[in-house]
Design a protein with these regions (language model features):
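Sec/Tat signal peptide C-region and signal peptidase I cleavage site
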Residues: 16-20
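Subset of outer-membrane beta-barrel
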Residues: 21-336
Length: 336
């Protein structure tokens, strides 16, 4: 019975880094920039709400599933002088501003949030985060930002779903009644630089954290800092067609470095399709639609790159989004 208890303990310990970085497991990680790096919070001049669902190893009895909801947007004060200008492109007014006026007009604050929930029927990982960033134009075409956030991570075992020979064992009864649980509160920071054709950012997660558990075995702190670098570029192949590669690299001392990459073709602001890769883990394809100016939908399918049986080889992911614009403005995304 002690062996069973040790296995359960090891599952919680192994789940901790996953809970801290569960957003990276999404194939469409670019849908949640504020979860990757706090500095990307409010990178767009509009508000967006996303909801997604990911099913891993479809067909397996204890297949993990992941759900998330997020929001991201920016606060900025529009120049009221635009209201008196009757032109088809209101942004044209900015062309006549001095550099100082331009920076003042386009500096803005970003606010974002993310909540993710992962379960396989026996254990649960959930995480919530709230992020803030300040964006300041460096030139007419390049801006920089700095951000910070706080994340709450919670991992626990649903002990009632396990079956053992001796149900009267005191360890099993304790797990059933109290659950084995681990909680963490972390501080995340990041910086970024971006323009209409590129973005690049660096962030640290778990810079500091508070920790609480339901068992003395977890009270010994094991602190570490995770580092993340992400970058993207878009190349205009024609006025209507763009090539958009992007990459995400994550590293901490507890796990091997992870590399997540994708490349997409985007047709106007209507349709995109591409391929993705996670080093030594999986590869797949993605497709997305922009239904009008506000509603978006993305789908991804992944195939495991390592040897596995067919029942564990189907990973599906769906993301729905809704964008809110200021009246009279339509802008392209800075993050892909």
């Amino acid at each position: 019975m002690k062996k069973i208890y040790l296995i359960l303990v090891m599952m919680i310990a192994a789940a901790a880094p996953v809970a801290a970085q569960q957003q990276y497991e999404l194939t469409q990680f670019f849908q949640n920039p504020q979860a990757l790096n706090a500095a990307f919070t409010g990178i767009e001049k509009y508000w967006q709400i996303n909801a997604g669902y990911r099913k891993v190893w479809a067909g397996s009895e204890f297949a993990p599933s992941q759900s998330f909801v997020s929001f991201n947007g920016s606060f900025y004060k529009p120049d009221l002088r635009l209201n008196s200008i009757r032109i088809s492109r209101p942004e044209a007014y900015e062309d006549n501003l001095s550099n100082k006026e331009y920076r003042k007009l386009n500096a803005r604050h970003g606010l974002g949030g993310y909540y993710g929930y992962v379960t396989n029927g026996m254990s649960v990982d959930d995480q919530g985060s709230l992020t803030y960033a300040y964006h300041l134009p460096l030139t007419r075409s390049i801006s920089m930002s700095a951000g910070a956030g706080v994340a709450y991570m919670n991992t626990y075992l649903s002990a009632g779903t396990y079956y053992v020979r001796h149900t009267k064992d005191y360890i099993y009864q304790d797990l059933t009644s109290e659950y084995a649980r681990k909680r963490e509160l972390a501080i995340n920071t990041g910086v970024a630089i971006y323009g209409s054709r590129f973005y690049a950012g660096y962030s640290t997660t778990r810079l500091a954290f508070l920790k609480g558990t339901t068992d003395d075995i977890y009270q010994e702190p094991v602190n570490y800092v995770a580092h993340t670098i992400n970058a993207g570029y878009q190349l205009y192949l024609s006025p209507s067609l763009r090539l958009q590669p992007s990459i995400l690299m994550a590293y901490d001392r507890l796990r091997e470095a992870s590399v997540y990459g994708n490349v997409k073709f985007r047709y106007k602001e209507i349709f995109w399709a591409g391929a993705s890769y996670r080093n030594k883990e999986a590869y797949g394809m993605m497709v997305g639609f922009l239904l009008g100016d506000h509603l978006s939908m993305g789908y991804a399918y992944e195939q495991n790159a390592f040897e596995f049986d067919a029942a564990h080889n189907n990973n599906h992911e769906v993301v729905l989004g809704y964008r809110f614009f200021r009246k009279g403005y339509r802008v392209n995304s800075y993050f892909w």
